[in-house]
A protein has these predicted regions:
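Bacterial Sec-dependent N-terminal signal peptides
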Residues: 1-25
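Extracellular and organelle-lumenal recognition/adhesion modules and their flexible linkers in secreted
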Residues: 23-280, 298-300, 313-328, 371, ...
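Conserved, mostly hydrophobic/aromatic
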Residues: 43, 131, 225, 292, ...
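An active-site-proximal structural segment forming one wall of the substrate-binding cleft
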Residues: 176-179, 185-186, 206-226, 281-291, ...
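Active-site groove signature of glycoside hydrolases
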Residues: 191-192, 232-235, 305, 310, ...
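Catalytic-core region of carbohydrate-active enzymes that cleave or remodel glycosidic bonds
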Residues: 387-388, 394-397, 415-418, 424-541, ...
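Short, well-ordered beta-strand segments enriched in hydrophobic/aromatic residues
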Residues: 574-581
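C-terminal beta-sandwich/jelly-roll accessory domains of carbohydrate-active enzymes
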Residues: 582-652
């Protein structure tokens, strides 16, 4: 007992000492204020950086249906291999290959595929192989081919044989279990015996994939606890031209019948060209809706408004922008999507959803029309969408766009038009320097509270280069800390800011076109960036209501390099305070909770690094991660030392 009393006295002395010498005196009004939307913190998916094919979509075969413009791109062939399209297995993907005898007993016919930057194979993992096959032109009674998985030294590590006896297309499957981990393997197929054989839709998935998605990447998303999931883009919604825009109806139904689409990111950046980057659409709208359910996020699909990318096309280009008189098919796509998501199984598109295995509706509540659109071309088209959507589905919220910039003439015009049209939310985008984020923590303090709410749909801090280097745009601690500081302003203004999503989401370490990105991966593993941990800490400590936190009667938004916000969680009956110290010195802070008598014990979660350029990487995943400790209040006052360069969450 005497020891406990001594420790208690020491603790009280320490708290009193901090209290007396505190540099900052924060006051929190504990009366719950504005409601924080469940959608406040979320994720945005776009197929950039090989985020879908070669990433979240777990298919390991590149160009599995031989539909790339170069039909054999991704494949190495040997012997007698030709591409055919006579009497195909799938009308919308008509090309397939024919393997015929090599013409000599010592020669072989076959082909091999290295997947996306090599095939990552895990020891003990089972891989599900499938292919559609038939005897070619009734040549022989049967044909046999061997399927192998091969390591970096060109040694087969597992194989299987498949015998084809029919001249009708049939699906053949086999499971391959590997006994070693391989970073860059390949799949090889040999024709072994008999006449010619036709093959199509050659596929390989890891057994632990979930609805065709990589298990580890799904887990990375689920553990963010996002409230909103925006998909499928982004610029791919628009397309470089209308022919390459994202068309959701091409992404539902059997994957074998989903037509190929060109990915606009395969040629956008001359220094990062990927001519083999296409969209097989195996990761389609049905899968996006399923993933939304899986991770507990509200879906937000975004559709083309009839304008191709305005960066890449002139406003008067009739080939790039649909005329108003021809807009109805685009509007029908939006109406049909809502029916696909929410309609009864007796409806046309509700039946498609049910036939895919989900008779229950997806409970879609909002839809985005257009991506980064600006100027007069956009609002007149958006208005046409809004009239018909609201007439048929008045409960669906509509998200418009303020364009690609955080301010300026086009931004102001966009907001003016969005208010005039009466959209529910306005999508703002800003990829800016850490200084911009630090200087804009009060961005939304003076926004008009009437009219549309804010959706910060794409944002990320792009780090300055060192010395004379260009912007390096890495996911380092400096960027993450500035985002954490800025997000105190999002939280404080939750009455007008309803949702926010960092962008982009995924990047393959060998296949990226854009950085920074929230989650990096190779073919075997992934890494959660420091920015990921900032997003996770906000999402898991979102709360239900804003609490007014002030110092000297004013919001804490960067004076003396400190930022803060506070929320209350009704379900957990918890008070949560977030403090960001971007200074090089520790800050001593008193936080007084007005209206409370005592807080008791709580926990402190700290994200800190002494090195602003510190990163989490595949070879060092936990370089910068949150650390948790206990804390105790003195009555209704919490006295803390906030470490230099840190983001701290206090929860009582």
């Amino acid at each position: 007992m005497k020891t406990k009393k001594i420790l208690s006295t020491l603790l009280m002395t320490a708290l009193t000492s901090v209290s007396i010498n505190a540099q900052h005196q924060f006051t929190i009004n504990t009366k719950p204020g504005a409601t924080i939307q469940p959608t406040m913190y979320g994720i945005f998916f776009e197929d950039i950086n090989f985020a879908a094919d070669g990433g979240l979509y777990a298919e390991m075969i590149e160009n599995r249906s031989f539909e790339f413009p170069d039909r054999l791109m991704g494949w190495n062939t040997f012997g007698n291999v030709i591409v055919n399209d006579q009497k195909p297995a799938f009308a919308r993907n008509p090309h397939y290959i024919t393997l015929s005898d090599a013409g000599h007993r010592e020669k072989r016919t076959g082909l091999e595929n290295r997947g996306f930057f090599g095939m990552g194979l895990k020891k003990g993992m089972c891989y599900d192989f499938s292919v559609y096959a038939r005897l070619h032109m009734l040549q022989g009674d049967s044909a046999k081919f061997r399927v192998e998985l091969v390591d970096e030294e060109d040694r087969p590590i597992v194989s299987t044989r498949i015998t084809v006896k029919s001249n009708q297309w049939q699906k053949y499957t086999s499971t391959l279990t590997v006994d070693k981990t391989v970073e860059k393997g390949l799949l090889r197929i040999f024709l072994e015996k008999g006449g010619a054989v036709d093959l199509d839709h050659v596929s390989l998935f890891p057994e632990d994939s979930w609805h065709g998605m990589r298990a580890d990447l799904v887990k990375d998303l689920a553990e963010l606890h996002p409230g909103i999931f925006r998909f499928p883009g982004g610029c791919i919604v628009e397309g470089t031209d209308l022919a390459t825009r994202y068309q959701w109806k091409n992404t539902v139904g059997p994957v074998e019948e989903r037509p190929l689409n060109e990915n606009r990111w395969n040629y956008t950046f001359p220094h990062r060209l990927f001519p083999n980057y296409y969209q097989t659409l195996g990761m389609g709208f049905f899968e996006f809706f399923l993933l939304s359910e899986k991770i507990g996020a509200e879906p937000l699909p975004v559709l083309s408004c009839g304008l191709a990318c305005q960066y890449q096309n002139d406003d008067n280009d009739r080939n790039a922008h649909t005329a108003m008189a021809d807009l109805q098919p685009y509007i029908d796509d939006a109406l049909d999507l809502i029916e696909f998501a929410n309609g009864p199984v007796t409806s046309k598109w509700g039946r498609v959803r049910a036939d895919m295995g989900h008779p229950a509706p997806f409970n879609l509540k909002q839809i985005g029309i257009g991506n980064e659109q600006w100027g007069p071309l956009y609002p007149e088209r958006l208005e046409a969408f809004m009239k018909q959507i609201r007439a048929k589905y008045p409960h669906i919220k509509i998200c418009g766009s303020s364009g690609p910039s955080a301010s300026g003439k086009e931004f102001d015009y966009g907001w003016q038009q969005m208010r005039k049209l009466g959209v529910d939310l306005v999508d703002e985008h800003y990829y800016m320097s850490p200084d911009w984020f630090l200087n804009n923590a009060g961005r939304y303090d003076h926004y008009n509270r009437k009219g549309p709410k804010v959706f910060a749909g794409e944002y990320a801090a792009h780090v300055r280069g060192l010395d004379k280097q260009p912007n390096v745009a890495m996911n380092n601690f400096e960027a993450a800390l500035s985002e954490a500081a800025f997000m105190t302003g999002l939280e404080r203004n939750a009455d007008v800011v309803w949702q926010a999503t960092y962008a982009p989401l995924f990047a393959h370490v060998e296949g990226w076109q854009w950085r920074p990105d929230l989650i990096w991966f190779d073919n075997l593993q992934s890494v959660r960036t420091v920015n990921w941990y900032v997003q996770m800490l906000y999402a898991t400590n979102r709360g239900t209501n804003v609490l007014r936190l002030t110092e000297g009667g004013k919001p804490v938004e960067g004076k003396e390099k400190i930022y803060a916000s506070a929320v209350y969680d009704k379900a957990e009956k918890a008070y949560i305070v977030k403090i960001v110290n971007v200074d090089d010195r520790e800050k001593q802070v008193n936080v007084t909770f007005e209206g409370l008598k005592t807080l008791g014990k709580g926990k402190c979660i700290t994200l800190h690094s002494d090195n602003p350029r510190a990163v989490n990487a595949l070879e060092n995943k936990t370089n910068v991660v949150p650390q948790t400790s206990e804390i105790e209040a003195n009555g209704n006052v919490v006295s803390v030392k906030v470490p230099a360069k840190s983001f701290v969450v206090y929860r009582f």
